[in-house]
Amino acid sequence: LDRSAKARRKNNRPESRIRAPRLRAPESSMIPRYSRPEMTSIWEPQTRFKIWFEIEAHAADALAELGVIPKEAAQTIWAKAKDATFNVARIDEIERETKHDVIAFLTHLAEIVGPEARFVHQGMTSSDVLDTCLNVQLVRAADLLISDIDKVLAALKTRAFEHKMTPTIGRSHGIHAEPVTFGLKLAYAYAEFSRARERLVLARKEVATCAISGAVGTFAQIDPRVEEHVANAMGLIPEPISTQVIPRDRHAMYFATLGVIASSVERLATEIRHLQRTEVLEAEEFFSEGQKGSSAMPHKRNPVLSENLTGLSRMVRAYVTPALENVVLWHERDISHSSAERMIGPDATVTLDFALNRLAGLIDKLLIYPENMQKNLDRLGGLVHSQRLLIALTQKGASREDAYRLVQRNAMPVWRGEGDFQSLLKNDADVKKYLSDTEIEEQFDLGYHLKHVDTIFRRVFGAS
């Protein structure tokens, strides 16, 4: 026991511990299966270091114009590093010693630039670089996501007009309600994603700010004109007032917007999943030649893309909570937000980018079955016209309570599969006190429910 205790004490001494190598984690933990290179490239280390350099170099330009540093120094910084490929492994090596990523980068930059590197980062703090870079990346990600939404909108519009007047049953609580058209279902989604696009444009604007204001945001060591120059060069605007960091309520709004968009993705995906159920089969995901639906059941054709989108949407929404909690920082700044942002920035944007592109393709190739829609419309023997009969009876003098009772007592047998709704109504003496056979038949006109589809489409898509 004594020997064992001594061994434990020896192994716990600092000089006896084995230090595990610090490996650079991927900028996005999303697996390649759910990633697209267009978005992941925004978050690659080389991209980040390139942005860091541009921020530092533009700041040096401004300092040179103000006479703070020699103009030749600013020119040398650009000349020696603007086309450089930064050595990620070398930066990691330096960071293992310094325990500071920005210092590690600046040390490596000095190895590239030489003596003039002493004029880099003058009057700045790490967050000036980190926050401005993060916002550049979020803006670029937003631009790509806006383009993704445009693809979804284009697919929805095409299919909506294709099935503008294709009648189908509308459902509330999952139960047959009244007729709609399949085009209207897609128009609903089009309007929702149009709103999503508007919100994302606003969210992009919200994070398109730059802070080059020094250690606590007072510009004590750097002229505010440097911030203005860097902001203009990076496609941003100066943050009106920062502490050591850009306020995180901006980022919270950005990620909350991504979460709402993810919910819109899931809403449409869930609709498709329901419509593909065997008992419904009004629409179906495209099933390619050679595709397999089940390892056990060769007949299966499952809505796997929609189900996949449901899961990815959950992930995007999960990233919203850390963004909201990052708003709360100590005094002029703490670092509690940093670790969360290093994950949620890449992961939320990469995931949503993939989901939107998958959704656009799903809509574009969606198989639609109007004949099954008609079968489902007829399935309840005309019960979907019950509200019109209710209104017709009240207009002929029946109280609403009596009209409701008369329609319901004839509807319930049909609900149980006993008889035809129209025939039962025609044989109900109390109903016949108010409506003739012809008037009853007129209430079963499917076209009546679709008479304002054109109006709705003009509201959603415009006059064209």
Language model regions located:
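Conserved hydrophobic residue
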Residues: 69, 74, 280-281, 399
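Catalytic-core signal marking the mid-to-C-terminal active-site face
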Residues: 29-47, 97, 104, 295-464
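Acidic, glycine-rich loop-and-beta core segments that form the ion-binding/anion-interacting portion
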Residues: 227-320
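A structural signal for small-residue-enriched, beta-sheet-centric alpha/beta enzyme cores
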Residues: 218, 231, 238-245, 374, ...
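Intrinsic disorder/low-complexity segments
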Residues: 1-26
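Short, well-ordered beta-strand elements within core beta-sheets of diverse protein domains
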Residues: 184, 252-260, 388-396
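A helix-coil-helix interface module used to build multimeric assemblies
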Residues: 26-219, 223-229, 238, 291-294, ...
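Short amphipathic alpha-helical segments with heptad-repeat character
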Residues: 50, 139-150, 157, 187-190, ...
